[in-house]
Amino acid sequence: MAAPRPRSDPGSVLRDRSFIRALADLVLPPACLACDGIIDPRDTARLVCRRCRSLLRAVPHPACTRCEAPRLVTSRSDEACAECRNWPDSLTVARSACLLLPPADVIVHALKYRGWPALASLIADRMATVRLPAAVRDAAVCVPVPTTRARLRTRGYNQAFLIAAAFASRTGRSTCDVLAREGHTGTQTALQPVARRANVAGAFRFVPERAGAVRDRAVLLIDDVLTTGATAAACAATLADAGALSIGLITFARAIDARRLTQSNGAMDDR
């Protein structure tokens, strides 16, 4: 009769893994996905170096109180914002953790197109520091912006869902895939605002058996990047149809026209 195999000690297994990882870091130090520089092995983030994380630029103020689009100091506070004036009333606020400037753009690209889903955790860490307006501060449900089936097959994951799950875990919320995307609308990247709105018109539906998660509740819509808000507006309208009371959008990065930042000529303050 064969002698029973000794049970492995979980602690020793973890120690062995830590040793192997430390040894691998000495032989092949991890490189930052944003700048290709060497990451300090003591840095727990590991995918993006401390310097690149410090270069993520906050959205400058003054800004629109609804969508946080930067305003010139000379703008009137009651002046209609061109960025969000076409949004549905149900999309009450939008906030972003940083501007879509280097290295944020490289981080987003690595998550979406270079097969680095683990970056969703780093992105969620940054998003968890965003101060939410009172209207959605107590929202308990995070809803990811859905992707198409074709992109899901190609990419292997929906980056918005990964971000939403990580963000919800950090902030004590739940995640629910209430929305689904119909057909293949094509990428929004090269489209102008009017074309973006047309491209996503009717592109989303809510899943009836999951609608109870958002009915009569405030909801946080989660995505990686806010550009014109066309996708978020279409999603918010669909969530409102499902019974959501108010919808706030939170993204990792916000795309800003470089001319807008240049015209401010330093008049805006980051905060």
Model-identified regions with their sequence ranges:
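Glycine-rich phosphate/pyrophosphate-handling loop used in enzymes and phosphotransfer proteins
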Residues: 1-271
